């Protein structure tokens, strides 16, 4: 008899994904993705996507998502902390605090929500950032959005 995945299983998977991110183990993260994973895909492009923010561009499939991690690899991580992980059915939300310095001199610090959606087999089928995209756009343009 097959067992179905639970919200707890999916939340544990996301905790493992963030642990892999902390180790720089991109392969372990990509292993958790469905072949057709929709990464930052929305019904309409977001303002950040229209502005060309490289880490918020829409991507499809693990090979394309690897490009997201290549972009992050060019950034300096100043702070990254998972504050909470909350699950409901096929979806898990992670509350994170993130601060990065970008190659062009821009910086951003933000508290974000990351929405992860799963299939029945426990693979991630969709990922979306919910963040202050104005900060991300400004940082991509070389601005330091951490200065008040």
Residues of each region from the PLM?
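Short, low-complexity N-terminal intrinsically disordered segments enriched in polar/charged residues
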Residues: 1-35, 144-148
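A beta-strand edge to alpha-helix "cap/lid" segment located at domain peripheries
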Residues: 2-9, 70-148
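Hydrophobic pocket/interface hotspot
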Residues: 14, 29-30, 37, 61, ...
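Hydrophobic alpha-helical core bundles mediating ligand binding, dimerization, or RNAP-core interactions
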Residues: 14, 18-21, 33, 65, ...
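Short, flexible active-site loop motifs that bind/organize anionic cofactors or intermediates
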Residues: 16-19, 55, 75, 126
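Short, mixed-charge, low-aromatic patches
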Residues: 20-29, 51-54, 71-73, 95
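A solvent-exposed, acidic/Ser-Thr-rich amphipathic alpha-helical stretch
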Residues: 35-89
